[in-house]
Regions:
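Short runs within selected transmembrane alpha-helices of multi-pass transporters and secretion channels
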Residues: 75, 143-162, 170-181, 199-214, ...
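Helix-loop interface residues and adjacent transmembrane-helix termini in multi-pass membrane transporters
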Residues: 39, 48-51, 85-88, 163-164, ...
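Alpha-helical transmembrane segments of multipass membrane proteins
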Residues: 39-42, 114, 156-160, 182-187, ...
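Transmembrane helix-bundle signature of multi-pass secondary active exporters and lipid flippases
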Residues: 27-80, 144-151, 240-305, 326-333, ...
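Small-residue-rich hydrophobic transmembrane alpha-helices
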Residues: 54-114, 151-170, 277-341, 372-395
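Short alpha-helical transmembrane segments in multi-pass integral membrane proteins
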Residues: 1-24, 82-147, 180, 191-247, ...
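Short, proline-centered helix/strand-breaking motifs
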Residues: 26, 62, 186, 341-342
Length: 447
């Protein structure tokens, strides 16, 4: 196919299992490295600042996810649309979709930047952030939001490259940015004693670097993937298609994060030790989840290209292989974290009060993280087929509504930290069962 270049993968021909791994593993590495660099923020403030600084950074994670997940979902929409056009080899539409996606990314980033400055303190107060960390949490969040245009540009540009089968160069950009982030963290916190503001500044600078690298790559690609500044603009037909896929996915992520914000509010009620412990353990949860998410994104891209090319049997194989790989790799990584919990958790804190809560979260949630494969892979396959609303609705019900009901009923009656944590595996089982059933029914009707 003419749009296939040396950095891309031909998803519509040849053996699938090796191409899925070649695509997914750099994608997983990108997400894990991104979280690792975020974990450096947490570890540096936890070890070289204070437990309050650690809690301030950790208390923002669910709120940050809430703000950006809508636009990450839209970037997924651009991935599906561009992948579909690549499968059909419609060059004009590929270019139009790429330029539309970049404009949407930058405009959305500016919007979130401005909005974030106004809502930071009111929302953190509404979440019940402990008084001993509220000022630090607000400071971190406001600085973090300055980098939103660059965060979204990286997400959209990497989505564009991944739609062509290129998951390696986004990884290289992330590695370069992460090295800068780590170095700045150590300098600004340890040497200049800037605390949470130091790690926030380091994050902003690293996001500028990663997005800048990917923009440079797109500016020097061959057509129709090349980004041409004079061609930047919004194509309404392509925007409509991107939003049809992206908005349901984004709203799902946003509502999902809203449920986590409510859970975070409940965690806050246990005090700063619980907030810090949960934040420390959550890092390992993210590592395991991003394995699943990488194979889910692989399912989206491979399914979309093969569906566009009319290769329906390969769509079935993509689902089967991504599910197997997701369960296997996530299960192995979770086992490493759980078995080595004493070593890993002490990287973040030596406070015994904090460790009590961290161990509880690790044993309950991280141990069973592989269960998320059921709904993530199935939902990804459905989006690859062009159906985004159904998996969004299922996820909102199974992983959001159920969690909110649990928090407002069971957790109020039994105010124990482990009671809050156990809703995660419960919701994963329910959501996964419904999602797999929906995918199989949809696939039967489609081909």
């Amino acid at each position: 196919m003419e749009v296939k270049k040396k950095n891309t993968i031909d998803m519509t021909h040849g053996t699938l299992w090796n191409k899925i791994l070649i695509f997914a593993l750099p994608l997983a590495a990108s997400s894990i490295l991104q979280q690792l660099f975020n974990s450096v923020d947490t570890a540096v403030v936890g070890r070289f600042a204070s437990s309050q600084a650690l809690a301030a950074v950790g208390s923002n994670s669910s709120l940050i996810s809430l703000m950006i997940n809508l636009f990450i979902g839209i970037s997924l929409g651009s991935n599906v649309v561009i992948s579909h056009y690549i499968g059909q080899n419609v060059k004009k539409n590929i270019s139009a979709a790429i330029h539309t996606a970049v404009v949407v990314a930058f405009v959305s980033g500016i919007f979130v930047l401005v909005l974030g400055q106004f809502i930071a303190k009111p929302v953190l107060l509404l979440m019940g952030t402990p008084q001993d960390v509220i000022d630090l949490a607000v400071l971190y969040l406001r600085i973090y939001f300055i980098g939103m245009p660059f965060i979204l540009l990286y997400d959209f540009c990497s989505s564009i490259l991944r739609s062509t089968g290129d998951s390696r160069r986004p990884l290289y950009a992330l590695i370069a940015a992460g090295i800068i982030n780590t170095g700045l963290n150590l300098i600004l916190v340890i040497i200049f004693h800037l605390g949470v503001s130091g790690v926030a500044i380091a994050t902003v600078v690293s996001n500028i670097v990663s997005s800048g690298i990917l923009l440079f790559i797109l500016l020097h690609e061959e057509e129709p993937i090349r980004l041409i500044p004079s061609a930047l603009g919004i194509s309404l037909p392509e925007l409509k298609k991107i939003l049809q896929i992206g908005v349901p996915a984004g709203l799902q992520g946003m509502v999902f994060s809203l449920a986590n914000v409510c859970i975070q509010s409940t965690i806050n009620s246990f005090g700063s030790a619980a907030v810090a412990g949960s934040a420390a353990a959550l890092n390992f949860e993210f590592f395991a989840y991003f394995i699943v998410n990488a194979f889910a994104q692989t399912a989206v891209t491979f399914t979309s290209q093969n569906y566009g090319a009319g290769e329906f049997l390969r769509c079935r194989k993509v689902f089967r292989l991504t599910m197997i790989f997701s369960l296997l790799f996530c299960g192995l990584l979770s086992a490493v974290f759980v078995l080595g919990r004493d070593f890993f958790l002490h990287l973040y804190t030596n406070d015994p009060d904090v460790l009590v809560f961290a161990v509880q979260r690790l044993l309950i949630a991280t141990t069973l993280e592989l269960l998320t494969s059921a709904y993530e892979i199935s939902g990804g396959a459905m989006r690859g087929l062009g159906h985004s609303l159904l998996p969004a609705l299922i996820t909102v019900f199974g992983s959001c509504v159920l969690r909110l009901i649990w928090i407002s009923t069971v957790c109020r009656r039994f105010h124990e930290f482990w009671v809050v944590m156990i809703i995660y595996p419960i919701s994963w089982v329910i959501t996964g069962t419904i999602m797999i059933t929906a995918y199989l029914l949809l696939r039967h009707e489609t081909f």
